[in-house]
């Protein structure tokens, strides 16, 4: 059992016998009213999203999910096929099921992901916190005011755009932090 104040992004709770992923949780306490937790939830089975406000002392059932290592096998349209690295079982997910990691999923990637199962059904995939990707396009370096941290836009092979350091060039391998939508960490070693 969890209380409302213990909810955080990534927590999975059970509502009406379905697993719901907490995507966002914001704790608020005012002088007059009791503390509340505003949450954005996603049903892991249907993909339905909703917002619910919980009292800090509301009791909620948490869900234990099974996790296995998997790699991306291939992409066919909006269907992504992942393979279990231990028994080579293939699992399919739609693009909407993995929308939070979709900007960093690309054909031929070798990252070992964490496949998340509920009642032996694959419901989502989580990438490692740091991944390495190749810069497909970026502008040239800016000359002049470089006293601070100078960033410029770059595009990855799958079309994802993010800001990178000014010295990064086309073809460079960069490290990306996949939490919170992804951000540039540095040049890959």
From Swiss-Prot:
Subcellular localization(s) per the UniProt record: Cytoplasm
Pathway the protein acts in: Protein biosynthesis; polypeptide chain elongation
Gene Ontology terms for molecular function: translation elongation factor activity
Domain of life of the organism encoding this protein: Bacteria
Cellular-component GO terms for this entry: cytoplasm
CDD domains: S1_EF-P_repeat_1
Keyword field: Cytoplasm, Elongation factor, Protein biosynthesis
Chain segments annotated as transmembrane: none
GO BP annotations, alphabetical order: peptide biosynthetic process
Pfam family membership, one: EFP
Family, per entry: Belongs to the elongation factor P family.
Function: Involved in peptide bond synthesis. Stimulates efficient translation and peptide-bond synthesis on native or reconstituted 70S ribosomes in vitro. Probably functions indirectly by altering the affinity of the ribosome for aminoacyl-tRNA, thus increasing their reactivity as acceptors for peptidyl transferase.
HAMAP family in the cross-refs: EF_P
Name this protein carries in UniProt: Elongation factor P
Organism lineage: Bacteria, Pseudomonadati, Pseudomonadota, Gammaproteobacteria, Pseudomonadales
């Amino acid at each position: 059992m969890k209380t409302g104040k213990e909810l955080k992004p990534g927590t999975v709770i059970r509502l009406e016998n379905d697993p719901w992923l907490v995507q966002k949780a914001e704790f608020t306490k005012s002088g007059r009213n009791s503390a509340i937790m505003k949450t954005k939830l996603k049903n892991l089975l249907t993909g339905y999203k909703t917002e619910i406000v919980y009292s800090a002392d509301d009791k909620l059932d948490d869900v234990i999910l099974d996790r296995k290592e998997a790699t991306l096998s291939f992409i066919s349209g909006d269907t992504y096929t992942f393979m279990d690295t231990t028994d080579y079982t293939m699992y399919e997910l739609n693009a909407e099921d993995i929308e939070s990691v979709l900007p960093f999923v690309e054909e031929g990637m070798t990252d070992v992901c964490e496949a998340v199962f509920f009642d032996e059904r694959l419901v989502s995939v989580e990438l490692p916190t740091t991944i390495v990707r190749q810069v497909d396009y970026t502008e040239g370096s800016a000359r002049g005011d470089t006293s601070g941290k100078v960033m410029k836009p770059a595009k990855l092979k799958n079309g994802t755009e993010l800001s990178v350091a000014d010295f990064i060039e086309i073809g460079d391998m960069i490290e990306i932090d996949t939490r919170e939508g992804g951000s540039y960490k540095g040049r890959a070693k």
